Regions:
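Non-catalytic cap/lid and distal C-terminal segments of serine-dependent acyl enzymes
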Residues: 1-133
């Protein structure tokens, strides 16, 4: 993603090539990839969306990664999860607690329902207008 896709897009398309004009979001396993890609590459994305996914553990490594991510100037970290999502709810709440502790600008949207496209459409519709302000 960071070494191949972003450079390709920036070379072949007319885009503003900086983190303040770059967003990433993913749902379910893609949300997990979003967490990993952004926490391992601080300073690449200004806007981050994680739908129906979170983090398993908050240890020293994760804390340091999120400190670096916060220091990189993330403008928005959006987390959405269904209240009946047995797969991701605990991890989503854990992620939100970490964001709160680290002082991120974040939004958490916990909706009725589970791990469904119905909810993911809600989160995308909610997050999209917040981008690039």
């Amino acid at each position: 993603l960071v070494k191949d896709i972003i450079p390709y897009v920036e070379k072949h398309y007319r885009v503003i090539a900086n983190k303040d004009n770059r967003a990433i979001a993913g749902l379910s396993m893609g949300g997990g990839h979003t967490v990993m890609a952004t926490s391992n590459n601080p300073g690449v994305f200004g806007y981050i969306g994680v739908f129906s996914m979170g983090i398993r553990n908050v240890d020293e490594t994760v804390t340091k990664q999120f400190q670096a991510l916060k220091a990189s100037g993330v403008k928005l970290y959006y987390v959405g999860c269904g209240a009946e999502d047995k797969l991701a709810l605990e991890g989503s709440r854990r992620l939100v607690e970490l964001l709160k502790t680290q002082g991120f600008n974040y939004k958490y949207n916990e909706t009725p329902g589970g791990h469904t496209w119905f909810n993911w459409r809600i989160y995308l519709s909610d997050m999209a207008p917040m981008l690039f302000r």
